[in-house]
Amino acid sequence: MMGACGAVSDEKEPVPSNPPALQTASTGNVHRHYIISPQMGDTVTIDVWTPEGYDGSSRRYPVIYMHDGQNLFDATTTWNHQSWEMDSVIGTLIADGKISVPVIVGIHSVAKSRKGDLMPENALKYLPEKRSEAVDEFLDTTSLRGNAYAAFIVNTLKPRMDALYRLSPERDSTFVMGSSMGGLMSIYAMSEYPETFGAAGCLSTHWIGTLDGNNAFSDAMYAYMDEKLPRDGHHRLYLDHGTTTLDSLYGPSEERMIGLVRSHGYSEERGTLETFVDEGGAHQESSWAARVWRPLQFLLGKK
């Protein structure tokens, strides 16, 4: 949420240092970068939030890579005039001593390519050859770039961020989080790159694919996760959903996925799993803003 303190800054390639201030954030600073993605053949807009005191510190910070970065901080610039209010929520958690102080890397999405960019491509091999027209329409196979997007984060964006910011590069300090299709990409990225991401936060995950009750996509994700989900005891997973609007369709698929995750050793007792049902929560940024403290505390909570 934009407010009176902190700043947003802007930079073009190449980058000698962090870009200067542009706008204000309620706490901390937001720096804007434009990073060329050879994997996707695009230039990707990146917003990096650094906490209060970052410039005067020599410490290294855990980092969360978040999808739909354009919706994280400033409701005045989003399509629906809502944001996750990440700067405000994190500022409160830090002030209350609830979390280790992080850096947030927000990866902007582009509406026309978002679905294809966040699609868990390798899960699609589990789809049946004969499937409904609705499933094929959902897949929109002419624009699938999920593998390229994930590779961009790991092979281009992360090295760049590690060089520009004082981040802890280790797996156990590097997390990925998003909602809806971003929830799918988060668990996918952790599964494809288990050596890079130590945990994933998945809010309102779009397990269902289509809206017609066809389970083909959900079944494919289940089969993919059964094979690829890390099960070494060193990874953690947060899963939630609301109960209204689009989220009202997610319950059965989410419960099935939670059962699978538990069968692979994730559990609350071990501190490797947290789940939540947001009664009345909708499929929108205001609902995610109201409960994002939960995955933040799970990912960053002080031990």
Predicted regions and their residues:
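C-terminal motif of bacterial Sec signal peptides marking the signal peptidase cleavage site
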Residues: 2-4
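Bacterial signal peptide processing site
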Residues: 6-9
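Non-catalytic cap/lid and distal C-terminal segments of serine-dependent acyl enzymes
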Residues: 11-303
